[in-house]
């Protein structure tokens, strides 16, 4: 096969599995961020493809020398930045098997098990998450689920489906308008706390996306949506879709579906719910309050690769009425047709997505869920939440800090006083590369996000992270071992300038940071 025979394949494959196993077991020994500069790889790899191939041992050696040093270690328990991109040993096996099978399952006939396993897995996941039954593929409803690549992809698809449904309806309601005129008046809504993918979906879908202001708790309320819709209707626009978020990117806030849902349903406004991260918590009865009002949504998405131990990419998406997406996306060429199409238990998923070809993602989902079981999944999610609560206790016990919000496995906090404190602290932590956090804003203030992530986070990892935060805070504020402030720098407020750093712009004086509890001399 190509330039590798079966024996070499087995040897290379075993070496690769051994590397991954050792890498994950010993990942705590590595700095979570790489020590490379932009363009480092251009100096290491040739500019052109080699004329003759190398043996796998040479390639594996170069992989270790050239590729691994450029990694940010997302599976490290010291990765506390973005929402996690988790994996598990069972998922890795499933991904490997799917790659070896090489299935392209855009229709049932292309590989029946690829389609049927996906239908079953989407019901398994929906039942695990205690979703309203109207979203499941069952005899008494029109619902159904599909695996997409990412939340971004799912949101974009929801916007496109809502757009096409609205255009069909509006052409009947407004025969005096051309289709082009109707499309030019479409408008969509989301919170200013939603993921950037929502705003991007408006750009790609050629729909004006209004970012509505959330309240002081970063929650979008029904009255805010109502006001915006009424303003737009008065200006001759046509509201199409509201994209709500359960678990915002910055602070994991939850839009109020109990207020938003009824208004959307009463005003022919498609309601899509992005629960990319927080959706995993639906499997826990104690967090059922998060999804109140979800039954009023027309579609929703949840990333298994964030918190259900399936590796990237794998996003579950459900529709209350699956016919809506097939009506919007169906393009049926003769070479794609087969005699079994149209069966509810064997959908042609090519009609449920943007691209034609699709991967056998349901295989890694099945292997992961069957290996772990629902009980173990719930246990691990609860454990991750307890780790975040442990970190929160550390923060609250230190009077220099304040917790701005804490929910699920995310803690948002800051140093009291001016934003300059927290900005410089985060800058110093990122430069050291021992743990990795990113910033957000909350009520106009700069905050630090501490996220539980990695393949196997433990209590000692929380101790390690807190010690890093505390020690860097001590250095920043000039605190000795007894907790006394020994900072004697002369602070010059008049000579302020801004400089670039890994977390944005920070304000500094030439004499050092201007501390909020001290007056500049």
Curated annotation (Swiss-Prot):
GO cellular component: cytoplasm
InterPro entries hit by this protein: Aromatic_deC, PyrdxlP-dep_de-COase, PyrdxlP-dep_Trfase, PyrdxlP-dep_Trfase_major, PyrdxlP-dep_Trfase_small, Pyridoxal-P_BS
Any GO BP annotation: catecholamine metabolic process
The UniProt record lists the keyword Nuclease: no
The EC number(s) this enzyme carries: 4.1.1.107
Tissue and organ expression note: Highly expressed in the cuticle and midgut. Low expression in the head and thorax.
Pfam families for this protein: Pyridoxal_deC (PF00282)
Keyword terms of this UniProt record: Catecholamine metabolism, Cuticle, Lyase, Pyridoxal phosphate
GO MF annotation list: 3,4-dihydroxyphenylacetaldehyde synthase activity; aromatic-L-amino-acid decarboxylase activity; pyridoxal phosphate binding; structural constituent of cuticle
PROSITE patterns linked: DDC_GAD_HDC_YDC
Residues carrying N6-(pyridoxal phosphate)lysine: 306
Swiss-Prot/TrEMBL cofactor(s): pyridoxal 5'-phosphate
Catalytic activity: L-dopa + O2 + H2O + H(+) = 3,4-dihydroxyphenylacetaldehyde + H2O2 + NH4(+) + CO2
Phenotype upon loss of function: Arrest of larva growing and development. Abnormal formation of the endocuticle.
Functional description taken from the UniProt entry: Involved in cuticle development. Probably responsible for the protein cross-linking during the development of flexible cuticles.
Record-stated family: Belongs to the group II decarboxylase family.
Record-given protein name: 3,4-dihydroxyphenylacetaldehyde synthase
Species this protein is from: Aedes aegypti
């Amino acid at each position: 096969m190509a330039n590798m025979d079966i024996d070499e394949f087995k040897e290379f494959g075993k070496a690769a599995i051994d590397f991954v196993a050792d890498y994950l077991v010993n990942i705590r020994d590595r700095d979570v961020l790489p020590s490379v500069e932009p363009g480092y790889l251009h100096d290491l790899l040739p500019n052109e493809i080699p004329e003759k191939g190398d043996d796998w041992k040479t390639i594996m050696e170069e992989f270790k020398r050239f590729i691994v040093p450029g990694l940010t270690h997302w599976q490290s328990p010291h990765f506390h930045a973005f929402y996690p991109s988790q994996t598990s040993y069972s998922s890795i096996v499933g991904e490997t098997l799917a790659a070896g099978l090489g299935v392209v399952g855009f229709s049932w006939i292309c590989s029946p098990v690829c389609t049927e396993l996906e239908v079953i897995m989407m019901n398994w996941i929906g039942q695990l998450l205690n979703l309203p039954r109207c979203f499941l593929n069952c005899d008494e409803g029109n619902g159904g689920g599909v695996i997409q690549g990412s939340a971004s992809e799912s949101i974009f698809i929801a916007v496109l489906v809502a757009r096409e449904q609205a255009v069909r309806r509006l052409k009947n309601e407004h025969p005096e308008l051309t289709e082009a005129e109707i499309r030019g008046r479409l408008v969509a809504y989301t919170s200013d706390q939603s993921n950037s993918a929502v705003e991007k979906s408006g750009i790609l879908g050629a729909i004006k996306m209004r970012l509505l202001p959330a309240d002081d708790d970063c929650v979008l309320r029904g009255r805010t949506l109502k006001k915006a819709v009424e303003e737009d209707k008065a200006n001759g626009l046509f509201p199409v879709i509201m994209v709500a978020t359960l678990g915002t990117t910055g602070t994991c806030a939850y839009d109020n579906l109990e207020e938003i849902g009824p208004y959307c349903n009463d005003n022919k406004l498609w309601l899509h719910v992005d629960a990319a991260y927080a959706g995993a918590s639906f499997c826990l009865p104690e967090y059922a309050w998060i999804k109140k009002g979800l039954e009023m949504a027309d579609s929703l998405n949840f990333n298994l690769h964030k918190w259900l131990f399936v590796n990237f990419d794998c996003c579950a998406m459900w529709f209350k009425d699956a016919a809506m997406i097939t009506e919007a996306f169906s393009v049926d060429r003769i070479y794609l047709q087969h005699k079994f199409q149209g069966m509810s238990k064997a959908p042609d998923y090519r009609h449920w997505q943007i691209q034609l070809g699709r991967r056998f993602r349901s295989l890694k989902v099945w292997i992961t869920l069957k290996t772990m079981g629902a009980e173990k999944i719930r246990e691990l999610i609860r454990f991750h939440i307890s780790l975040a609560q442990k970190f929160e206790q550390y923060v609250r016990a230190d009077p220099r800090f304040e917790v701005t919000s804490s929910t699920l496995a995310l803690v948002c906090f800051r140093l009291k006083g001016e934003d300059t404190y927290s900005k410089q602290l985060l800058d110093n932590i990122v430069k050291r590369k021992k743990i990795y956090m990113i910033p957000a804003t909350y009520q106009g203030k700069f905050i630090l996000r501490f996220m539980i992530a990695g393949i196997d986070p433990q209590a000692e990892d929380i101790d390690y992270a807190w010690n890093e935060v505390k020690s860097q805070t001590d250095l920043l504020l000039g605190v000795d071992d007894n907790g006394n402030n020994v900072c004697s720098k002369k602070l010059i407020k008049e000579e302020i300038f801004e400089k670039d750093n890994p977390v944005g712009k920070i304000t500094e004086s030439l004499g050092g940071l201007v501390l909020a509890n001290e007056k500049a001399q």
